[in-house]
Amino acid sequence: MANAIDTRHYDVIVAPHITEKATLLSENNAVVFKVADKATKPEIKAAVEALFNVKVTKVNTLTQKGKTKRWKGKPYKRTDVKKAVVTLAAGQSIDVTSGI
């Protein structure tokens, strides 16, 4: 768990994703993060373990496709967002709401 913090770890984790569903997942030792589009599961695991000093057991990722919207009659597409659901070991926790 004493992984060295690399500057690339800050590029992998973009922001915590705080929603009602993410709050329900936190009861099962899971935390949801918005991550870089090109980030892989091993990179996400290494970044979370190094930045938050916790043990990660599982990483699930998904890419939420951006919606097509209209502005002044012209269609445009919102950007895609990649999310990672990080499951922590028993007894581990991350408080992502402490800075809010």
Swiss-Prot record:
Record-level GO BP terms: translation
Gene Ontology cellular component terms for the protein in this record: ribonucleoprotein complex; ribosome
PANTHER family: 60S RIBOSOMAL PROTEIN L23A
Family per record: Belongs to the universal ribosomal protein uL23 family.
Lineage of origin: Bacteria, Pseudomonadati, Pseudomonadota, Alphaproteobacteria, Sphingomonadales
Subunit structure: Part of the 50S ribosomal subunit. Contacts protein L29, and trigger factor when it is bound to the ribosome.
Keywords recorded for this protein, A-Z: Ribonucleoprotein, Ribosomal protein, RNA-binding, rRNA-binding
Pfam families: Ribosomal_L23 (PF00276)
NCBIfam families: PRK05738.1-3, PRK05738.1-5, PRK05738.2-4
Organism of provenance: Novosphingobium aromaticivorans (strain ATCC 700278 / DSM 12444 / CCUG 56034 / CIP 105152 / NBRC 16084 / F199)
Coiled coil: none
UniProt-recorded Gene Ontology molecular function terms: rRNA binding; structural constituent of ribosome
Annotated gene: rplW
InterPro entries to which the protein is assigned, alphabetical: Nucleotide-bd_a/b_plait_sf, Ribosomal_uL23-like, Ribosomal_uL23/eL15/eS24_sf, Ribosomal_uL23_CS
Biological role stated in the UniProt entry: One of the early assembly proteins it binds 23S rRNA. One of the proteins that surrounds the polypeptide exit tunnel on the outside of the ribosome. Forms the main docking site for trigger factor binding to the ribosome.
Name of the protein: Large ribosomal subunit protein uL23
